[in-house]
A protein has these predicted regions:
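Periplasmic/extracellular electron-transfer cofactor-ligation site
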Residues: 21-50, 67, 98-101
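Sec-dependent N-terminal signal peptides
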Residues: 1-3
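Extracytoplasmic electron-transfer domains, predominantly the class I c-type cytochrome c fold
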Residues: 46-100
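Electrostatic cytochrome c docking/interface patches
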Residues: 7-23, 39
Length: 101
């Protein structure tokens, strides 16, 4: 019985990640690109292999991602509800908080 429940949970998490990945690609990808790093300061440094700012982070909770997206910070503008719904942003935030992309 526990194996069945675990399998259903794994399928649910996989479906949530797929939905989050699709939303991230369509709603955030124009700036962050499919690897999630986006602009040069956030991405891996060419040539020396050092990590970019986002790759160094291991504490991006879903709540933090959601708040930053709604309010904006630094060079990242806020994302209004008319562009990305609360539910879509929640799915994106959960996807990113799981270490994706």
């Amino acid at each position: 019985m526990a194996a069945v429940a675990l399998g259903a949970l794994s399928q649910g998490a996989a479906a949530a990640d797929a939905a989050g990945r699709t939303l991230f690609t369509t709603r955030c990808g124009m700036c962050h690109q499919t690897n999630g790093m986006g602009v040069s300061i956030l991405s891996r440094r060419p040539g020396d292999g050092s990590k970019g700012l986002l790759e160094q982070r291991d504490n991006l909770s879903a709540e933090f991602v959601y708040a930053v997206a709604r309010v904006g910070t630094g060079n990242m503008p806020r994302i209004p509800r008319g562009e990305v719904s609360d539910e879509e942003l929640r799915q994106i935030a959960l996807y990113l908080s799981r270490g994706n992309p």
